[in-house]
Design a protein with these regions (language model features):
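Nucleotidyltransferase catalytic core that binds NTPs
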Residues: 1-129
Length: 129
């Protein structure tokens, strides 16, 4: 499994099938989402990709919150690899990044940055604010 920090040209990946999140705890819903991403990527001879953020957005948006995690970064990566994920992309979460509109995020990150062809997200996912 490839681990990337930051965006790389989208031409370097075939048919990117992407999910976005922090995946703390890796519960049944996370597994189902990862399974769908992997199955779609395999069907399309593409890349199963997890897009995640470092630091966690809450650490930037609400630094007063004492955020605790269920899984370590190493445990998350091991679970992604066991699920069949091909690549994990870590993006630095900053106040400037948080200020991107949903349209800017879709264009700059999803389309231009990682070449997303299909995107799968969980039930409570929201783009931007």
């Amino acid at each position: 499994m490839k681990i990337s920090r930051g965006l790389t040209p989208s031409t370097s990946r075939p048919y990117s099938v992407v999910t976005i999140g922090n995946f703390d705890g890796h519960h049944h819903g996370h597994r189902a989402l990862l399974d769908r991403v992997v199955a779609t990527a395999r069907r399309e001879a593409g890349t199963a990709l997890v897009l995640t953020f470092d630091p966690h957005p809450v650490k930037i948006l609400a630094p007063q919150v004492n955020l605790m995690f269920l899984t370590t970064p190493e445990e998350k990566l091991a679970r992604f690899e066991a699920a069949g994920i091909d690549e994990v992309v870590f993006l630095e979460f900053t106040t400037a990044f948080a200020a991107l509109s949903p349209a800017q995020f879709a264009k700059q990150v999803l389309c231009d940055g990682i070449g997303t062809r299909e995107l799968y997200v969980g039930e409570h996912f929201a783009f931007g604010k």
